[in-house]
């Protein structure tokens, strides 16, 4: 059980048999009446977002999620197949369960698969990934003095803004949370 006073961004709670993640929260103490917590919750399974208000100190069941480090091995139709490299056990997730994470997911990548009551819910990517640029405009030497950017399409199909000096075939490090370029990858 968790108190509504202890809500933090990312906290998971269980309401009506579903897992919800706290996206935003605000403790409100009106001049008259009792305090309450206004929150924005996102259903982990469906992605639906709802606003809910709880009394301050209200106890709610906390959803205990399990994380397992698995490797993305291949795709079968619309399903993404992940393998536990120690037990060789396979786990399948649909494209809907993967969601926005699919734009950075490539075969052989280690990710955390989040499960609840034995069923996989979602994928957590590492904070940064190394991907190759497959499509971008050629950079011209001396283009700008301040360092402009241009769009680049990566090997997974993701599009990020990169500095003008980068070209096709270069490997770059990308922040998966903000979709931003972090730097060139050496080696």
From Swiss-Prot:
**Which compartments is it annotated to reside in?**
Cytoplasm
> What top-level branch of life does the organism fall under?
Bacteria
Q: Name one GO biological process term.
A: peptide biosynthetic process
Q: Which GO terms describe its molecular function?
A: translation elongation factor activity
The GO cellular component terms are: cytoplasm
Q: Which Gene3D superfamilies match?
A: 2.30.30.30, Nucleic acid-binding proteins
Question: In the record, which residues are listed under signal peptide?
Answer: none
Principal localization reads cytoplasm
Q: Which UniProt keywords apply?
A: Cytoplasm, Elongation factor, Protein biosynthesis
Matching SUPFAM superfamilies: Nucleic acid-binding proteins, Translation proteins SH3-like domain
This protein's pathway: Protein biosynthesis; polypeptide chain elongation
Q: Which InterPro entries match?
A: Elong-fact-P_C, NA-bd_OB-fold, Rib_uL2_dom2, Transl_elong_fac_P/YeiP, Transl_elong_KOW-like, Transl_elong_P/YeiP_cen, Transl_elong_P/YeiP_CS, Transl_elongation_fac_P
SMART domains, A to Z: EFP, Elong-fact-P_C
User: What family does this chain come from, according to its entry?
Assistant: Belongs to the elongation factor P family.
Q: Which HAMAP family match?
A: EF_P
Functional description taken from the UniProt entry: Involved in peptide bond synthesis. Stimulates efficient translation and peptide-bond synthesis on native or reconstituted 70S ribosomes in vitro. Probably functions indirectly by altering the affinity of the ribosome for aminoacyl-tRNA, thus increasing their reactivity as acceptors for peptidyl transferase.
What is the designated name of this protein?
Elongation factor P
Native organism = Parasynechococcus marenigrum (strain WH8102)
């Amino acid at each position: 059980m968790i108190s509504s006073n202890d809500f933090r961004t990312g906290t998971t709670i269980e309401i009506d048999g579903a897992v919800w993640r706290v996206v935003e929260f605000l403790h409100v103490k009106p001049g008259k009446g009792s305090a309450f917590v206004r929150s924005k919750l996102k259903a982990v399974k469906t992605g639906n977002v709802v606003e809910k208000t709880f009394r301050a100190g209200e106890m709610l069941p906390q959803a205990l999620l399990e994380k397992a480090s698995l490797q993305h091995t291949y795709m079968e139709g619309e399903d993404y197949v992940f393998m536990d490299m120690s037990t060789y056990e396979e786990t399948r997730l649909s494209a809907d369960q993967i969601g926005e994470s699919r734009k950075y997911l490539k075969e052989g990548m280690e990710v955390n698969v989040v499960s609840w009551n034995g069923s996989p819910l979602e994928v957590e990517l590492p904070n940064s990934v190394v991907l190759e640029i497959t499509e971008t405009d050629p950079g011209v030497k001396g283009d700008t003095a301040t360092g402009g950017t241009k769009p680049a399409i990566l090997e997974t199909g993701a599009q990020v803004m990169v500095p003008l000096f980068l070209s096709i075939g270069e490997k770059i490090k990308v922040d998966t949370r903000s979709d931003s370029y972090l730097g060139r990858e050496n080696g």
